[in-house]
Design a protein with these regions (language model features):
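Short, charged, intrinsically disordered terminal tails
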Residues: 66-81
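Charged/polar low-complexity intrinsically disordered segments, enriched in acidic residues
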Residues: 1-63
């Protein structure tokens, strides 16, 4: 897998994780988390990284971790609309 593919996969994983969080979370909690954007709560970021199917070698790249976070925020923003 190339780095570019890992970035794309990370974004998709982030979206899936964000969608699952949004489904299970109360609306007020979601608004509070979105108000803190781009700072992601550390417990959610830890779950996102630990739950990733990507090899650790890719997770060490800033671009991949950024894509995970971006996917998460994209999913949360979609639920707000």
């Amino acid at each position: 897998m190339a780095l570019g593919e890992a970035v794309q996969a990370a974004h998709e994983e982030g979206q899936e994780f964000g969608a699952s969080v949004a489904r299970d979370a109360p609306a007020l909690w979601l608004e509070a988390v979105l108000a803190r954007k781009p700072r992601m709560p550390s417990d959610l970021e830890a779950r996102l990284l630990q739950g990733s199917a990507l090899p650790i070698d890719f997770l060490l790249h800033d671009e991949v971790r950024h894509a995970l976070r971006r996917g998460f925020w994209d999913a949360l923003e979609r639920t707000r609309r």
